[in-house]
């Protein structure tokens, strides 16, 4: 496959861009996750970045990508409301994998946000959307711009939620390439990779958490729940970072 020209793709209308990406994705679907990463590093423009929420399976993508580009910037958007175990997990993986961690936060501190808006996560879907815009979307957009990002790796998987079930391996989002190397993996493949490379799940995995975000909008899985029901009171799955703008 030839090197993709981001400027050409961004100049296309949506239908032309979709058609151009379809052929590439047909080939990427038949590659292993490792091959997808190596292909991207060879054919997509630099600088590249990797985003991580340091959730349940985070070690997979972090190891997968940094094994091939060790110094790639790893973007974390820190809301200030993560679980203590998440902060400990971040420290552990940063040391273990020698991550080039870049932490971005909202301009307004958590305490100031609560003073100004109250507890947004208790104010229904609109409150949650504003909370995510302040604490997740704006910091991530700022990170992508400040780091000059042209290619963005992320660890999304289709089996995680209905909103991710049809995502392609490669897309253009926010005028940059976004590659999802493990998009088609199931839980068994995740477990196998972690075991093979001596990596751990997030500490809360053993306590019944399937997905981990902020303390106030994450709950344990119970029988009858889908994974996406454990976040944002079941009102939504995405925080906005991975949604088309």
Swiss-Prot record:
GO CC field: cytoplasm
GO molecular function: phosphoadenylyl-sulfate reductase (thioredoxin) activity
Pathway, per record: Sulfur metabolism; hydrogen sulfide biosynthesis; sulfite from sulfate: step 3/3
Keywords of this entry: Cytoplasm, Oxidoreductase
Catalytic residue positions: 239
Subcellular location: Cytoplasm
Function text: Catalyzes the formation of sulfite from phosphoadenosine 5'-phosphosulfate (PAPS) using thioredoxin as an electron donor.
Full protein name: Phosphoadenosine 5'-phosphosulfate reductase
Protein species of origin: Baumannia cicadellinicola subsp. Homalodisca coagulata
């Amino acid at each position: 496959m030839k090197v993709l020209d981001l400027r050409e793709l961004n100049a296309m209308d949506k239908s032309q861009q979709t058609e151009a990406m379809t052929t590439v994705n047909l080939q990427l679907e038949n590659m292993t996750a490792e091959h997808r990463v190596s292909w991207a590093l060879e054919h997509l423009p630099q600088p590249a970045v990797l985003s991580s929420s340091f959730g349940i399976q985070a070690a997979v993508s972090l190891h997968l990508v940094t094994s091939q580009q060790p110094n790639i910037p790893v973007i974390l958007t820190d809301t200030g409301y993560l679980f203590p175990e998440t902060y400990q997990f971040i420290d552990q993986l940063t040391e273990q994998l020698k991550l080039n961690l870049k932490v971005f936060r909202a301009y307004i501190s958590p305490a100031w946000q609560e003073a100004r808006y109250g507890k947004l996560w208790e104010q229904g879907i609109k409150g949650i959307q504003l909370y995510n815009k302040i604490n997740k979307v704006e910091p991530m957009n700022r990170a992508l711009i400040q780091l000059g990002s042209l290619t963005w790796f992320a660890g999304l998987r289709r089996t995680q939620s209905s909103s991710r079930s049809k995502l392609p391996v490669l897309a253009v989002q926010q005028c940059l390439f976004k590659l999802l190397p493990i998009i088609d993996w199931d839980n068994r493949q995740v477990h196998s990779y972690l075991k093979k490379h001596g990596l751990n799940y997030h500490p809360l995995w053993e306590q019944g958490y399937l997905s981990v975000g902020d303390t106030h909008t994450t709950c344990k899985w119970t029988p009858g729940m889908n994974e996406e029901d454990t976040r944002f009171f079941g009102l939504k799955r995405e925080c906005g970072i991975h949604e088309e703008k």
